[in-house]
Curated annotation (Swiss-Prot):
Homotetramer. Optimum pH is between 6.5-7.5. This is NADPH-dependent FMN reductase ArsH. The gene is arsH. The keyword NADP applies. FMN binds at residues 43-50. Keywords: Flavoprotein, FMN, NADP, Nucleotide-binding, Oxidoreductase. Its EC number is 1.-.-.-. It comes from Rhizobium meliloti (strain 1021) (Ensifer meliloti).
Amino acid sequence: MSDDDSSHDLPAANLQQLRLPDSASLRPAFSTHRPRILILYGSLRTVSYSRLLAEEARRLLEFFGAEVKVFDPSGLPLPDAAPVSHPKVQELRELSIWSEGQVWVSPERHGAMTGIMKAQIDWIPLSTGSIRPTQGKTLAVMQVSGGSQSFNAVNQMRILGRWMRMITIPNQSSVAKAFQEFDANGRMKPSSYYDRVVDVMEELVKFTLLTRDCSAYLTDRYSERKESAAELEHRVTLKSV
């Protein structure tokens, strides 16, 4: 749009940086590789129900055609307690960049997600140079509880997903009394809780396939285009001086 287009009553906007939605950009050629999904879980316990739930999610995602990697948080330092060059930090960041979608699984402890879960997310930056490790990627959230069903952890993770500029899918899973939902071999028993996990993983793969090839377009923002144009104009002005 040009600035002299009087048919638009938007005096506060830079019309040169406004873009009408382009349906063709929302339907690019589809990638043929398997969806890449990263799973994070928030416990270091030997018998960890969030880890067991993460493994069930992995099996389902692989059935639905995804390539899945599960990050082991053992050895990950607390945020700011080690340099970003720490091997576990680098592993986590590289996996986040690799992924096209993520699953976050946390126990609920004292009405919140665990510190182990939060530490993993805190180590992932919003941007590293021109790379944004999570922006535009899909996210599914799940939690386990030792008592009655609760949604505090998944609600918190949804807020974090928004701050990380992710596309959090509508469905979610909260497994109550998790110690009753797994057998002696660590496999989840048939139940409505398991059915919900299936629903969530199926939905995540669908949303990932739907958005991964146009995520850059979906997150292309007017304010950032305006800022980039101003920076470019400033550089050109400096060169001409």
